[in-house]
Regions:
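Targeting-peptide/extracellular-domain and disordered-appendage signature
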Residues: 1-184
Length: 184
């Protein structure tokens, strides 16, 4: 979820959730949440955190992928976020209408909901055109026209806006299923 208050404004909330089954650092989960992407601080001024059950994996994802994603470029908070131990994670919903993720870490409880889902579409992006420039990307994407993101019961700012992605009109709020990055 990459959210803005105005389509031509800056991103005000950035969220990326990973459920990883294979990596150089094993399995794990990582929720990168920047509620103040341009702030070069985290707690207590802003909830700029990575909630994870595998620190090595989380740092690998942030350093090699998240920091390369267009919405996260220039997000000073990324370098200053706190890494918080994961205490629980659960998914619910389906891929046709609504999907939810719940993540709990020390002093952080996050609920993410993607609704009004579009038709799934397959993406195959060669390394030369990928965010990292080093990996080919293969994934099934599903756009969401509406999202809800709450932290500790408080709604996060922003809403999804239209974007161009992989040669088609898309949204800044989406699900990426079976996302596979292959180093070339």
């Amino acid at each position: 979820m990459y959210l803005k208050e105005k389509p031509d404004g800056p991103f005000v909330t950035l969220v990326s959730f990973f459920r990883v089954v294979a990596s150089p650092h094993g399995r794990g989960h990582a929720l990168v949440l920047l509620e103040a992407p341009l702030l070069h601080r985290s707690l207590p001024e802003a909830l700029n955190v990575c909630v994870t059950d595998n620190d090595a994996l989380a740092h690998y994802l942030v350093d090699n992928f998240v920091s390369c994603f267009g919405a996260f470029k220039g997000a000073e908070a990324l370098a200053h976020m706190d890494y918080v131990p994961l205490e629980g994670v659960a998914a619910s919903g389906d891929t046709r209408s609504a999907y939810m993720e719940w993540v709990k870490g020390r002093n952080v409880e996050v609920s993410l909901s993607w609704e009004d889902l579009g038709q799934p579409f397959l993406v195959n992006i060669p390394k030369e055109k990928s965010a990292t420039g080093q990996h080919a990307l293969h994934s099934l994407f599903v756009d969401a026209r509406r999202v809800t993101a709450t932290v500790n019961g408080r709604a996060l700012k922003g809403k999804p806006v239209p974007r161009e992605f992989a040669g088609r009109q898309s949204s800044t709020a989406f699900l990426a299923y079976s996302e596979t990055w292959v180093k070339m």
